[in-house]
């Protein structure tokens, strides 16, 4: 077809088209706009994986972050050439290269001191710095980066273990959880905890609720919360329904 109106704002026009085609939700657009206003340093763990490298390049092109890709320089450059990707503006960090020895040693010293009471030694910590998840999360922990993306080569359970060791849980909490965001025609729903705590007691549910409330507000939504179990109206006097009842009662009183 032929456009009947002059297009003055091409960015807004592209957003409108993406919405019409179902490629972008209001929440996604808000996140992109926020990220563009203040792009952060994001570490992409598996730089040698095509999907991870494509994501880093696309994120740079969209202006939503300053990508830092972990991996072997030659391998990543070869892959980029095969995929016809430009690495301009992409920082590559080869964590195993001798040039990174000083940083590995600094990270190992910080981690071993942090976990000394758990029996961690400098030698063990230094060995871990050759692993991308430990190295990348130490970048975040020390302020060398702002966020870390991983998971293509490792199970989430292993990633969680490293995150607890390196970054840890906020002092006011004893538990943490994961959240999935569901975009539907009726609106956006935040679901937690979807992966971590299999049989949460009331204390765990309270922590999950507080963390969820904080996260939902971060996304500029007003939280209206519901807790689900397998029993209604006190029909079951033990198990998760009791935990849910205790957690809801606490949240209402506090």
Model-derived regions: residue spans:
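Anion-binding alpha/beta catalytic cores of soluble intermediary-metabolism enzymes, centered on
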Residues: 1-254
């Amino acid at each position: 077809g032929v456009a009947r109106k002059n297009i003055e704002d091409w960015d807004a026009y592209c957003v409108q088209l993406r919405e019409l085609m179902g490629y972008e939700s209001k929440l996604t657009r808000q996140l992109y706009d926020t990220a563009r206003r203040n792009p952060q340093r994001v570490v992409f763990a598996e730089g040698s994986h095509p999907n991870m490298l494509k994501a880093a390049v696309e994120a740079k092109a969209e202006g939503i972050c300053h990508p830092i890709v972990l991996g072997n320089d030659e391998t990543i450059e070869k892959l980029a050439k095969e995929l016809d990707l430009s690495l301009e503006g992409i920082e590559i960090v080869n964590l195993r290269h001798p040039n990174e020895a000083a940083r590995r040693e600094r990270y190992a010293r910080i981690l071993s001191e942090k976990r000394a009471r758990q029996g961690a030694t400098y030698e063990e910590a230094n060995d871990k710095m050759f692993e991308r998840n430990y190295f990348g999360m130490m970048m975040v922990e020390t302020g060398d980066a702002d966020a870390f993306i991983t998971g293509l080569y490792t199970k989430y359970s292993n990633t969680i273990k490293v995150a607890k060791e390196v970054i840890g849980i906020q002092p006011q909490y004893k538990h943490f959880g994961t959240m999935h965001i569901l975009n539907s025609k009726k609106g956006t729903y935040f679901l937690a905890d979807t992966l971590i705590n299999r049989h949460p007691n009331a204390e765990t549910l309270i922590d999950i609720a507080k963390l969820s409330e904080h996260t939902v507000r971060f996304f500029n939504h007003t939280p209206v919360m519901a807790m689900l179990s397998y029993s209604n109206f006190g029909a079951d006097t033990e198990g998760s329904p009791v935990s849910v009842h205790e957690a809801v009662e606490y949240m209402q009183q506090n």
